[in-house]
Amino acid sequence: MGEEPRLPKHNEEEMQENEQPKKGILSCVSSPVSWFKMLAKELHWSFVFGVMVVYGISQGLGGSLARVGTEYYMKDVQKVLPSEAQVYSGITSIPWIIKPLWGLLTDVVPILGYHRRSYFVFAGFLGVIAMLSLSLHNELHIVLALLFLTAGSASVAIADVTVDACVAQNSGTHPSLAADMQSLCALSSSIGSLVGFSISGIFVHLIGPQGVFGLLMIPAGLVLLVGVLVKEPRTSFVEYKQINQNFVNASKAVWKTLKLPDVWRPCLYMYVSFSLSLNISEGMFYWATDSKAGPSFSKELIGYIMAIGSIGSLLGALLYQYGLKDYPFRDLLFWSQILSCLAGMLDLVLVRRWNLKFGLPDILFVVIDASVSQLIGRLKWMPLLVLSAKICPPGIEGTFFALLMSIDNAGLLTASWLGGLLLHVFNLTPTLLYSQMRFWIRTRIQVFKNLMMLNL
């Protein structure tokens, strides 16, 4: 047989050069798909599905709709002052503060033989009832409204604790995939938030805040579905007799782990870092939507601004996954903390209207502010999540991870209530917020000094 004719060398090189761009484009699509397949193969598809539902749909999409809907519900339906709305926001976040309780229950109290599945079902059912009640009653008393909003928050918190326990458990059995699992959580949350904020303003405008609460029954129903589908071995009946002993053992294990310097120091850092940054987001929201001195953003625009801000969170998750996950832990926290302090000063620039002096329209500056703040916040959050997942003792993953996350939430609650106190003491209504920002300048400068002196 004769030899097949060979192409000239320069023709082969040209063909390879022409194929390289195609391979580059295909790799951009195939790489994430391969990553998802790898996670599904190593960790089971139901786990990946559960993470995407809880973080992407329940917390991301649902959380975005709930945030915008609740802010307009308090402002337009309940007609409360900014300082009151700030305090009420802290009350509805209490289920996130007591996350260790949910974690302890999922670890030591199986329901119908399951540690995780039953709690997913309960969380989904609770969310459906709470959102249905809010959507159907037009003139709810503020106490009942807070009760249902807190129940809805508890629904999301319980699902979050349960899926975090699954993540921590898998991080113990697959330590090499710990960062990948946190990236999956972060990407799901960021994409869900992006979609949720994009449509939140439109839905609030079209169907009102209570209509949005009705839509939130869908994410809660999907969480219930996760409880049906997630893979988990059934607990033997003998374990029910050991619940009291399990409580004691879990408490001892948590306390023993917390006393380690490598554990309590990051915990202290997390609390101080969040609590020192006073939060007046409700006052800023009222000012941005109502005050004549402010930009008077519409409902749709508020949703779009938050959506674009979520792009920053998504970019932060991608940047961590593909560039910073192997970066030294302390260095990453140090620089993200400094950048976080600087980003916190951007609100001051907006309220003082300095952006207009530089020719930056309000909408453009707010978008930049939201994107930068979300990106830095995600970079600051990711290494803490990875560390928290890795130091969880085996057998009490849900309890300990929930405890670590509740420390963060306690810091956020402290910042929120201190911010509400600031709004109340200085009578910072929407029209007075602008004129009283001198105090806010001094507060931010002091916070920056405190965090710079923090021993990382």
Locations of regions flagged by a protein language model:
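Loop-to-transmembrane helix entry
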Residues: 50, 79-94, 176-184, 284-312, ...
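Transmembrane alpha-helix termini and helix-breaking/packing motifs in multi-pass membrane transporters
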Residues: 104-111, 132-136, 193-214, 320-326, ...
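C-terminal ends and interior cores of transmembrane alpha-helices
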Residues: 121-140, 338-359
